[in-house]
Amino acid sequence: MRKVTVIRPQKLHFPFSKGKILIDSIECETVKAGKSAEIEIPDGGHDIQVIFAAAPPVNSNMLRIEQSDGDTVFEVKIVVPLKNDPTYAELTKK
């Protein structure tokens, strides 16, 4: 497992400040603009999909992910599942 920091860029505006981000089935709190939250992801996790299980953002965009040591920085696309998509229901039930 690698610990990474999720950073929400200031330019992104989301209609909510609470919720969950599911990253390879690992949850972390949704990050407010300009703030960060640490999560752990499996090794080889560069194929991560970020899925908002709460209210989806207005526009899909990218989140910047960097390792806690600051060496590796990569971006992942936010995938917004449709609420009538069975995948959405599967991901959001806890």
Specify the residue positions occupied by each region the protein language model found.
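Short loop/turn and low-complexity linker motifs enriched in small/turn-promoting residues
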Residues: 1-94
